[in-house]
Amino acid sequence: MNLRASCIAAFLCLLVQLCAADFSPEVTHRIVKGIGWDISYFEDSSNVIHVGEKMVEMSYDDGVTWTEIETIGKSSDILVKFDPINVNRAFVFSRIGDTHFVTDDKGKTWRSFKVQPKKSLKDRELGMHHVFNFKDDSVLIKLEYCKQYPEADDCDVSYFYSSNSLKSDPQLLPIDAKVCVVNTLLDEPTILCVKDTRNSFGHVVKSELVSSKDLFKTSESIKHPGFDSGRIIDVRLESSFLVVVTQKDRFNELSSISISVSKDGKTFDTADLAFQMAYGAIRFLPSDPQSLFLTVAASTSKDTRPQGTLYSSDSSGLHFKKLLDNVDLGYSARVEYVHGVWLAKTFEEDPIVEPNDDYFGSPIAKTSSHISIDNGLTWNKLEILNDDSCKLKDGCSLNLLRFDAIEDKNKYVTGPTPNILMGFGITGNTDNFFKAKTYISRDGGLTWTNVFSGPGIHAFGDQGNVIMYVPFSGRNHGPATEVRYSLNQGRSWGTYKLKEPCFPQELITTTDGTNTKFVLSGIVEHQQMSEVLYAFDFSKAFDGNKCKDSDMEKVYARVSPKDGQPNCIYGFKESFMRRKADARCFIDRTFEDVKVDVEQCPCTQQDYECSPYFKLSEKGVCVPDPKKIAEKCKSESKDTLKLPDMQIVAENKCEQKSDSSFVTETEFKCKDFTGENVPSSITIGQSEFDGFLSQYSYVATGPDLSDNLIVKTDTGLIYASNNGGTSFVRVPFKEKIRGFYVGPSLGRVIMITDGDVFYASNNGANTFYKYKVPTSASNGDVTISFHPTDESRFIWLSGNCAVGSSTCVAYHTEDFGRSFEKLIDNAMACDYVSPVLDITSTELIYCTVVDGNKKKLASSTNYFKEAEIEYVLDDIVAYAIKSNFVVVATLDEAHTMLKAKVTADGFVFADVDFPSDFKIEAQTAFTILESSPHSIFMHVTTDSTSGHEKGAILKSNSNGTYYVLSLSDVNRNEVGYVDYDRLGLLEGVLIANTATDSKEGKNKKTQISFNDGSQWNYIAPPAVDSDGKEYACKGQPLSKCSLHLHGFTERPDYRDTFSSGSAVGLLIGMGNVGEYLKPVTDDQTAAFMSADGGLTWKEIKKGVYHWDFGDQGTILLLVDAAKDTDEFIFSKDEGATWETMKFASSPVKVLDLATVPSDTSLKFVIFAGSHQSQSSTQLFAVDFSQFFPRQCQVDLENPESDDFEYWTPMHPESTERCLFGHEAMYLRRAAGHDDCFIGSTPLDQGYKMVRNCTCTRNDYECDYNYFRDNDGTCKLVKGMNAANRMAEMCRKPGVFEYFEPTGYRKIPLSTCVGGKQFDALKPRACPGHEKEFNEAHGRDVGGSKIFILIFIPLLVFFSAVFFVYDRGIRRNGGFQKLGQIRLDDGDDDFNPIEENIVDVVVNKTVRGAIVVAAGTFAVFKTIRKIDRAMFDKVTSLLFGRRPGQRNYVRVPDDEDELFGTFDENYEDELNEAADVDFNVDEEPEEFTELTAEPANVDERLFDIDDQSEDDAVSAEHPEPESTHE
């Protein structure tokens, strides 16, 4: 019986195949000039629109015939958009221009409409476009206007609306919004838009969600705390969920993201899914009314595909659970028409890219495909049925590369036929496209059968009963010459030979897959730039027979592979009727969707979810949510609450008998969730590493993102985190890692191994490339020298590079390690110099080369390809590259003196001149502390005795050549590190420790400078300690009692500093108050803090602590560094108050405390030793991200009304709030505003330089060869004088002048103006160079210069005088006529000739000259008389003459005397009245013998203009005065 049945089945199958082979579809084709842009079906119709080159055409018979749309015309760059609701409507948008087109009858007729963009956008192209139905005839259109290449991603969004189905031109929506959506959750649809308010700097300072029912004639704002604080970046309607995506930090696009969800369209709650928007990707997937599905990107780089995590929510949309990790974000899709079935690709855990897995510069991804039939709760790999070499039990499965049937404008769909899927992929776990084959599934994707040996495109017709397949290419990678089709659901295939072979572009049928007609578009190879359009018609297969009920079979969706039973989702299971595969008929229900039957299921645990007061744990159990319970207690004001742990999923259809089997009520005491028991918003995470901590580093992967953290232990293991230390993965390197280097470019990391390979990452250790080393690291140490700006270039140095050895070699790569070229042999060190010095030669490289027992400095501008190596310096010790300078330490010929040379251009080196009394022995070292465009700070060792190491800090001039002493006896350690710190953000504030010898070793004291090292002072101690007790410093000078801080040489991590790179003015350090700095283990050691840039300090807490700054100083965190501890202290108000929190279950030994280098993160990590194992390290991640309820508001236009205030640093000796010659103001969070975080708020844009101050002594430092004496003045060093200065400077070649120094030079950072100029230099000529000096300063007196400077001005002057005399005096009667002019008679007697404007100007000049001459003469005579009177008074006091007599000056009455009759011997006239003293005393003495005053006083002396003629006459001849001795 079984045999007979098998034979019948085989016969029927063969018969079907023969019949299929005999059938051939009806096919038409046409060739179209140019390559088409798009081809699409209108929904539920046979109408097809085709966008070709410079034309748009329609077919109304499934692609058989075509008609060009004349209304649209010859448009060359257009976009087609279908209305998502109205299936009859579609749009044609033109990228260029403002005329667009619309159809309301599926393309039969078209009409134009115009959209007028803003004037500022008229020159842009149309990018993305979206269409929303609002209500009735209302249409909302979103258009993006984008800049042209290469700025095509810079787009501005505009929304337009029409209330009459675009019968008239749409209008601009009266709201400036980038995001709008139609909210259909309400009874009446409304438009929701995001409205941003920006300041003058372009920053979003406010973001609000506004709603309108009348196209924003009126609107209302929807309130939610998350909206007010952050920035809303997206609003969308997903099934029954209205979702608002908010960026927590308005000023950082990569900041954490929160999701707020509404089910009623009005009220929102914040979901518990918060994540870092580090890679700009959150993708919402097709969702059900019961659950919201989305993926969140975890990493991306230009060399790898984006990957992330798949999440689903509960029925409220507020609580999310993780479904799948490492998901390929481009290949995750829900299977259409079936609830709960998902297909996804995941990346393998191994982040190592092997050399053979790299092609075309990109890695072949290791991925695998998975399927879930229970909404993502469980996942299975895909089984292949007809491949014995790939069995699921052996770990082999199908890896689909693509499984979509139609790409419907950015939406992947699996096909319209339930349970029938098709796609291409490979066996194994790689994504090698060239090895792909095509597979088909008839059970919804659980099992697959190979049907073709290559990849191609496919489409389904008649609910899967017709399948067309077109390979991407034919033989030898040429065009496809045939298409394949199946009429029995893929069991057998027919072939049709194409009349015109082509490379297929699109294969389409009706959108619901119910038609038996298809349209294929492809590129024709032999026709230049042409497209072929094929129309296939299978309707006559099976003689047009329509299926009967007997031809159909019932098929269940989601059949479990374990027991063969259908799986229930949301309380129901689904089935549908499908044609039997061997039936010879068509369903022929065109435009009719597949009917799905629903059957109710009994309720199970899967139909329940956690109640609102519980949350899902990592183990999948509902546990109490303290935050929600606290809110419930507060709202109901009860002592106890009974709350259920679970509830049935909303809209679940399961058959429910009782909740008791699944729901448990728990009683809670509200006192446990209120008051001090309120749960903390600070989260603590814990990780453990094998081995002891040996190296760690943060790696920046974006401009404002440094959350990637790499940890290495002494076992050679590497652990990596991309979320700030919250979680780690061990990177599975096969080799032991010796160490790693982090490059200056974003994401660049190199791992050095003991073997013949190394690993390189370009995305912050998310993935690594494995490469061969140029020389094995086993030969010696390896050094990597990165290019400062080119991320693909670095230099590899390896080998035994000791002096006398020749095994060290330098190699260069330009492709980040894929290949190397040899640079130079015997190189100990190499560096790229050009980017540092910013010179035109972009390839300048320096190398320290070993040559026998000497080291030389080699340079090259073409990677040492010269015939001979150029050595710029022969005998060097080392070189240091700092910004704008390269400093080289050299030895003299006798090796008795260490010298330094400096270059600013990379080619010319200048000698470094130390102060004349500063001698350096050959074995003495110097350390380049730092450099800037203004100067170099250098520490020169003066005592290298073990245990007594110290030296002097020298500071250079602007070109790095001349140095002055800044501070003596500065402490250093045995390896050359110096107790020196420059405080971040503050200009020129330095801290250093000096040392003096003692029996115990060193006595160290801390000094601070507020003027860039010109002046140093001890730090004034606080008045009281942290317990309120007074320090015993009263009455003592600072030299005997001051604050001392442990410096750079005593830090366990040299990256720790007193100050922060972002918290301006905040300083923290460990130390003590007293005469000297005590050992760190001393009981007096405590933590001290300054909030004003080091002016004043206070003690925080006794003990020794690690410290760090978070969020630009809004969080200060300290943890005990000496004793085991399980808690840390933190401050949220800049150190005003401190709180304590536990981070560990038991005390641990803290090794270090760290956060991102910029101190802008709210995440910290605490490294600690493990008590359980002496060979492991613990890490505790402390996260304050949810600690602050809001972001601080900043209003740079009105700073007094926001959360910030201005703070001004100042010099302690200044009363003008000045530092470096100017008053500067920095923005800091205001006191009392400690409920907000700063984030990436651009505080630097609020920086103000209020004014430049007048220059004072604080703006100057001692000049070269001068030192600061105890009295604060600058004096010449011993043995130097001005002659030394002349001889020293003039002996240099090419020098013709020297300067007489004042001993002072202006500090380069100072911008002061005016005031006292301490540095006013006077140039002097070097002996024998007077001529060059005079020429340089314009002092040579050649004949030509004399002529130009003297004779030409005189010639011009006399010419002008003669012209005025000729036109203004001689022509008007000469000087005799002018002598008649009276100052008090106006111009009645003077009527000059005025024939033109020149005469007017000349005559006015003459008048003015007369008045000026008269007044000047009178003043001159008065001054002479006063001077004579003063002389007489002095002589009278000395020789007995008596004061009291008044002297008067006679002023001539008539101006004619000024010019004609005045006595020329005016000295005699003055002497006539010189015998009387002019009394100028304020309080004259009393005398007993007085003389009578003269009867006739000439009062015109004091009021010339008011005198009458009578007065003048009476005063003309006064009587002689008598004098009594």
From Swiss-Prot:
BNR repeat windows: 58-67, 101-111, 371-380, 439-449, 484-493, 1088-1098, 1130-1139
Stretch list, region Disordered: 1503-1525
Composition skew (Basic and acidic residues), residue ranges: 1514-1525
Topological domain spans for side Cytoplasmic: 1367-1399
GO cellular component: cytosol; Golgi apparatus; membrane
GO biological process: Golgi to endosome transport; Golgi to vacuole transport; protein targeting to vacuole
UniProt-annotated location(s): Golgi apparatus, trans-Golgi network membrane; Prevacuolar compartment membrane
InterPro entries in the cross-refs: Sialidase_sf, Sortilin_C, Sortilin_N, VPS10, VPS10-sortilin, WD40/YVTN_repeat-like_dom_sf
Residues the record marks as carrying a glycan: 959, 1252
Membrane-crossing segments per the record: 1346-1366, 1400-1420
Pfam families xrefs: Sortilin-Vps10, Sortilin_C
CDD domains: Sialidase_non-viral
Signal peptide start and end residues: 1-21
Bias type Acidic residues, positions: 1504-1513
Topological category with respect to the lipid bilayer: Multi-pass membrane protein
Regions of this protein lying in the Lumenal compartment: 22-1345, 1421-1525
Keywords in alphabetical order: Glycoprotein, Golgi apparatus, Membrane, Protein transport, Receptor, Repeat, Signal, Transmembrane, Transmembrane helix, Transport
Family, as annotated: Belongs to the VPS10-related sortilin family.
Function per UniProt: Functions as a sorting receptor in the Golgi compartment required for the intracellular sorting and delivery of soluble vacuolar proteins, like carboxypeptidase Y (CPY) and proteinase A. Executes multiple rounds of sorting by cycling between the late Golgi and a prevacuolar endosome-like compartment.
Protein name as annotated: Vacuolar protein sorting/targeting protein 10
UniProt source species: Clavispora lusitaniae (strain ATCC 42720)
High-level lineage: Eukaryota, Fungi, Dikarya, Ascomycota, Saccharomycotina
Gene name of the encoded protein: VPS10
